[in-house]
C-alpha cells in the first residue's frame, strides 16, 4: 500500500510527471511520484510505502 504526500522539495507547477517521479525517488526516498491537480494547482506528489 502506498501513501500520498505532497512533495517537500518541489516548487511551482508540476508539468512533468517524469521529473516529479525522479525527484521524489532520488531526493525524498519515495517509491514514485506524479503530478496531480489539487485546488486548481498542478502539484508534485510523492508516494511512500505506508
From Swiss-Prot:
Disulfide partners: 3-50, 14-35, 20-44, 24-46
Pfam families on file: Gamma-thionin (PF00304)
Main location: secreted
Localization annotation: Secreted
Superkingdom per UniProt: Eukaryota
Keyword Secreted in annotation: yes
GO terms classed as biological process: defense response to fungus; killing of cells of another organism
GO cellular component, one term: extracellular region
Biotechnology: DmAMP1 expression in heterologous plants such as rice or papaya may provide a broad-spectrum disease resistance.
Function: Possesses antimicrobial activity sensitive to inorganic cations. Has no inhibitory effect on insect gut alpha-amylase. Induces potential changes in fungal membranes and increased K+ efflux and Ca(2+) uptake. Interacts with sphingolipids and ergosterols found in fungal plasma membranes.
Name the record gives this protein: Defensin-like protein 1
Amino acid at each position: 500500500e502506498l501513501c500520498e504526500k505532497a512533495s517537500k522539495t518541489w516548487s511551482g507547477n508540476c508539468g512533468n510527471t517524469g521529473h516529479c517521479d525522479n525527484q521524489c525517488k532520488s531526493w525524498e526516498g519515495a517509491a514514485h511520484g506524479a503530478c496531480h491537480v489539487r485546488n486548481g494547482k498542478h502539484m508534485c506528489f510523492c508516494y511512500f510505502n505506508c
